[in-house]
Amino acid sequence: MNTEASQDKTVSMTTGERLRQAREQLGLSQQAVAERLCLKMSTVRDIEEDNLSADLASTFVRGYIRSYAKLVRLPEDELLPMLAKQAPLKVAKVAPMQSFSLGKRRKKRDGWLMSFTWLIVFVVVGLTGAWWWQNHKAQQEEIVTMADQSSAQLSQNNEGQSVPLTDSNADNSAPLADNGSTPVDTGVAPQQSQTPAVSGSATAQQPAVVSPSQTTLPETTPAAPTAPLPTADAGVTAPAVDPNALVMEFSADCWLQVSDANGKTLYSGSQKSGGKLSLAGTAPYKLTIGAPAAVQIQYQGKPVDLSRFVKSNRVARLTVAAQ
């Protein structure tokens, strides 16, 4: 009778109660069990009170109970079937609510995270677009300003060059008038010298009339063709032999400004596609180019590298000097 009563009592006990009873029979405390099983004391307490968390996987629960049973010398075959009967009831009551709340919190957290991520993306895109627009606008304003300055300089240069042009024309017209009047005077002078010669002695005046005509004709004829030839040849060949010439070829319309070491503006204006420009001055040259991709520059037979300006798509400001 006592045996049957003890068996009924054992069957009615839960897994945690049987483990606690076996621990007390061996005289072990919960702290000692926790240290031997490398578990927290709260976990040992939850196992004995059958109050394991629903978040804990069943594999870990079975492992804890199996280790606890070996420690207190209880057969595992008796405890695990009892655990299978107890666990579904608790899990069925608690797990759905906890999983629902966890899923809801996770979705809420993911929603905030996605919103924050999209906000950062929009801010980065907006700042990038604003930065690009400011640079583009600044470049356009700079090109317009340089074009206005070049047009103003060209108008000033044209006004300054108008006076020398009129002076040169006046100077050119003056020698022409003198050259035209000289043969007239020489032609009249012999006639005036001949009239008194007829009234006097004709024989004495004849050599004087012939000698001026013979002496003036050789002087005037060679002077006209020989004088302009050296100046014309020198004006054509002088720029071609300048070693400091700056040669530029244009593949598209481009605005540029070039000045030499003395601060003299050699060129300021626009060039069309297919144009070629050769400038000579005192090195180093200072260049400002509105469209670096549209021009190829050679100096002393070597190309000038403009790739850094082409890649950044900005106005080129550089100094070209002898290497």
UniProtKB/Swiss-Prot annotation:
CDD domains according to UniProt: HTH_XRE
Topological category with respect to the lipid bilayer: Single-pass type II membrane protein
Keyword Cell membrane on entry: yes
InterPro entries: Bact_Cytoskel_RodZ, Cro/C1-type_HTH, Lambda_DNA-bd_dom_sf, RodZ, RodZ-like_C
One Gene Ontology cellular component annotation held by this UniProt entry: plasma membrane
Localisation per UniProt entry: Cell inner membrane
Topological region Cytoplasmic: 1-111
Keyword Manganese among record annotations: no
Annotated PROSITE patterns: HTH_CROC1
Keywords: Cell inner membrane, Cell membrane, Cell shape, DNA-binding, Membrane, Signal-anchor, Transmembrane, Transmembrane helix
Biased composition (Polar residues): 149-172, 179-214
Chain positions covered by the region annotation Disordered: 149-236
Superkingdom to which the source organism belongs: Bacteria
One Pfam family named in its UniProt record: HTH_25
SMART domains: HTH_XRE
Entry GO MF terms: DNA binding
Periplasmic side: 133-323
Transmembrane regions listed in the UniProt entry: 112-132
Function: Cytoskeletal protein that is involved in cell-shape control through regulation of the length of the long axis.
Family: Belongs to the RodZ family.
Domain-related comment: The helix-turn-helix (HTH) motif in the cytoplasmic domain of the N-terminus is involved in the formation of spirals to maintain the rigid rod shape. As this protein is anchored in the cytoplasmic membrane, the HTH motif may contribute to protein-protein interactions to form the RodZ helix, which is localized beneath the cytoplasmic membrane. The C-terminal domain may be critical for determination of the rod shape by probably interacting with enzymes required for synthesis of the peptidoglycan layer, including PBPs in the periplasm.
PANTHER family: CYTOSKELETON PROTEIN RODZ (PTHR34475:SF1), PTHR34475
Stated name of the protein: Cytoskeleton protein RodZ
